[in-house]
Amino acid sequence: MEFWLSWVFLVAILKGVQCEVQLVESGGGLIQPGGSLRLSCAASGFTVSSNYMSWVRQPPGKGLEWVSVIYSGGSTYYADSVKGRFTISRDNSKNTLYLQMNSLRAEDTAVYYCAR
């Protein structure tokens, strides 16, 4: 059984600030259960390493679910459903957030969003 992990992009304008904050996600694909996938989220308008950054997801027909967070100091936390399978990380030189997803399951099918 195959399933689709989608990617989208989010654009937000900070209220009262003459600065565009943009998060552009990529890396979705059609994956077999048990497979791996890495999502990327390239940020502009702010510094990823100076903020806490999260991944959330929305399974088909359901609400948003929190997946993982990385704090400015580097501490990481995960939802129980993905712990041990997913890894959040960032590349400060590229101002990019990542989500490495291993041992994927059918229930991981969702649209994934990065969020500041």
UniProtKB/Swiss-Prot annotation:
PROSITE patterns: IG_LIKE (PS50835)
Region Framework-1: start-end pairs: 20-49
Location of the region described as Framework-3 in the Swiss-Prot/TrEMBL record: 85-116
UniProt-annotated stretches for the region Framework-2: 55-68
GO BP annotation list: adaptive immune response
Keyword Disulfide bond: yes
Top-level division of the source organism's lineage: Eukaryota
Disulfide bond annotation, renumbered to this chain: 41-114
Annotated signal peptide: 1-19
Protein name per Swiss-Prot or TrEMBL: Ig heavy chain V region 5A
Organism: Carassius auratus (Goldfish)
Lineage of the organism: Eukaryota, Metazoa, Chordata, Craniata, Vertebrata
